[in-house]
C-alpha cells in the first residue's frame, strides 16, 4: 500500500490530510482518507472506500463514513450487468433500488415506504434528439408488496425548441384531483441577438401564473460588462405596486457590481 500526507493552512489552523491505499484480496482496493487538525490525535473525519476492478472499470462497492469509530456508517453498492448501481444499501438498513433502460437511463428508483411496500419514481424520456436524458413523464408511485402500483402524482414535460428560445412546460396532476398545475421555463436560443443571453434563462412561470422575464444587454457603467433585468409580472401583465424589476450589473467574472430594485407605481418603475 501507499500513504500520502498533505498539510494545509498556517500555524495552529493547519490541517493534515492522509490518503492511504491498500490492495485487498479479490481484485479490490481500499482507500482511507482522513483529516485532522495539526495538534489533534483523532481525525475529524475518516472515510474508507472499497473499489473493485471489473470489465466496467473501478466500481465503488462500499463507502464508510466515520471509519474506525463507534459511529461508522457504511453504504453498500450492487451493480447490474451495465455496471450501473442497481441497489444502494443505506447505513440504517434502508435501500434505494434502480432500474434502467438499454441506454442506461433511470426508469425507476424506489425505496421502502413507511406504509409498507415501496415509494418510487418512474421516468420515461423525451427521445426528441440523440441521447436525450430529458424526462417526458415522471410518475410518483407506491409499489405494494405484491407488486401492484398506485400513481400518486404525474408530471408531464413538453419541449419546444426554436432558434429564438427553448421552452419546457411541466404539468402536474395528483391522484384523485382534477387540478392541473402548469409551470414553464424558457431559455434564449442560438438566435438571440446578444450573445451572452444564448442558453440563459428567458422566462420562468410558476404554477400561480407569476412570471419572471429576463433580458440581457451590454452594460457601460459600474465596471460591468452585462446588465440583466428581471421583471416580475402576473399572467403576462404588469401589476402596479406588485410587479417588481431588479437590475443586476455583472462583471466579466460573473460578480454583481451593482444591484437595483424597482417597483411599478402604475405609471412607471420607481426605485
Enumerate the language-model features and the residues they cover.
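Beta-strand elements of repeat-based all-beta scaffolds
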Residues: 1-90, 94-271
Amino acid at each position: 500500500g501507499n500513504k500520502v500526507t498533505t498539510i494545509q493552512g498556517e500555524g495552529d489552523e493547519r490541517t493534515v490530510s492522509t490518503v492511504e491505499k491498500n490492495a485487498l484480496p479479490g481484485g479490490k482496493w481500499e482507500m482511507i482518507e482522513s483529516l485532522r487538525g495539526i495538534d489533534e490525535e483523532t481525525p475529524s473525519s475518516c472515510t474508507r472506500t472499497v473499489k473493485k476492478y471489473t470489465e466496467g472499470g473501478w466500481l465503488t462497492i462500499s463507502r464508510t463514513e466515520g471509519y474506525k469509530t463507534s459511529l461508522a456508517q457504511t453504504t453498500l453498492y450492487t451493480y447490474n450487468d451495465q455496471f450501473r448501481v442497481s441497489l444502494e444499501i443505506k447505513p440504517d438498513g434502508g435501500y434505494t433500488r434502480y432500474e434502467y433502460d438499454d441506454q442506461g437511463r433511470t426508469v425507476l428508483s424506489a425505496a421502502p415506504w413507511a406504509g409498507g411496500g415501496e415509494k418510487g419514481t418512474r421516468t420515461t424520456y423525451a427521445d426528441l434528439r440523440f441521447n436525450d436524458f430529458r424526462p417526458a413523464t415522471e410518475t410518483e408511485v407506491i409499489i405494494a408488496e405484491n407488486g401492484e402500483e398506485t400513481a400518486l402524482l404525474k408530471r408531464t414535460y413538453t419541449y419546444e425548441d426554436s432558434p429564438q428560445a427553448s421552452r419546457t412546460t411541466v404539468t402536474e396532476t395528483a391522484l384523485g384531483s382534477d387540478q392541473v398545475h402548469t409551470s414553464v421555463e424558457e431559455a434564449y436560443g442560438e438566435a438571440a441577438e446578444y450573445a451572452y443571453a444564448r442558453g440563459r434563462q428567458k422566462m420562468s412561470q410558476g404554477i400561480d401564473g407569476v412570471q419572471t422575464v429576463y433580458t440581457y444587454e451590454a452594460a457601460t457603467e459600474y465596471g460591468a460588462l452585462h446588465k440583466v433585468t428581471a421583471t416580475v409580472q402576473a399572467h403576462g401583465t404588469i401589476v402596479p405596486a406588485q410587479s417588481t424589476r431588479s437590475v443586476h450589473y455583472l462583471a466579466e467574472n460573473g460578480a454583481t457590481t451593482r444591484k437595483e430594485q424597482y417597483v411599478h407605481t402604475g405609471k412607471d418603475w420607481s426605485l
